[in-house]
Design a protein with these regions (language model features):
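Accessory nucleic acid-recognition modules appended to NTPase machines
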Residues: 1-97
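Short, hydrophobic beta-strand segments that form beta-sheet elements in well-ordered domains
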Residues: 125-133
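Conserved beta-strand segments of alpha/beta enzyme cores
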Residues: 75, 128, 144-146
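Arginine/glycine-rich "motif VI" loop of SF2 helicases in the C-terminal RecA-like domain
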Residues: 68-69, 117-126
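Short conserved micro-motifs at the rims of enzyme active sites and ligand-binding pockets
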Residues: 37-39, 101, 111-112, 141-143
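Active-site-adjacent loop/helix micro-motif of nuclease/hydrolase catalytic cores
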Residues: 106-115
Length: 153
């Protein structure tokens, strides 16, 4: 059975109570997304209002496909609370949470990872985090968080 869409659920547990619980919808094919939204060229997409959302869609789809191609279930969630604090992806593996933020920037700031601390209220352990972005090389923000170029995904 082939799927065209990904339904991403919010991460929740008893300690995190102020969640927005609406699921998110992503497409496996970003080319189809661009066609449906009438973004007809790379230049139009790059300067358009949806460029960040398309990048998030791409990264979510690629991470999910990587898990599925390895025969694993991707335990992928997102976090958004009523104060509009958001984590784009939370990967859960063996009870450990790995937060991922996605930004269409070549120089993401360390302020992006502050929201990761919200997961410390969870009963699950928080581990390494990442900011996936347009920076050309892999680097570290600090000992626990990395900057990952989108081309690595």
């Amino acid at each position: 059975q082939r799927q065209m869409c990904i339904r991403d659920s919010p991460y929740s547990n008893n300690m995190l109570k102020r969640l927005v619980k609406t699921p998110k919808l992503y497409f496996y094919d970003t080319g189809l997304v661009c066609y449906l939204t009438k973004w007809s060229s790379a230049e139009t997409l790059q300067s358009g209002a949806m460029n960040g959302a398309i990048l998030v869609n791409y990264v979510v789809a690629e991470i999910r496909k990587t898990y599925l191609n390895c025969g694993k279930d991707p335990y992928m969630y997102y976090y958004r609370d009523k104060d509009a604090r958001e984590i784009d992806i939370i990967l859960e593996h063996d009870g450990v949470l790995n937060p991922i933020e996605i930004k269409k920037s070549a120089n993401p700031g360390s302020e992006l990872i502050k929201v990761f601390k919200l997961l410390d209220k969870s009963s699950a352990k928080r581990s390494k985090g990442a900011v996936v972005c347009m920076k050309p090389e892999l680097s570290a923000i600090d000992r626990e968080n990395y900057i990952v170029p989108v081309w690595i995904i």
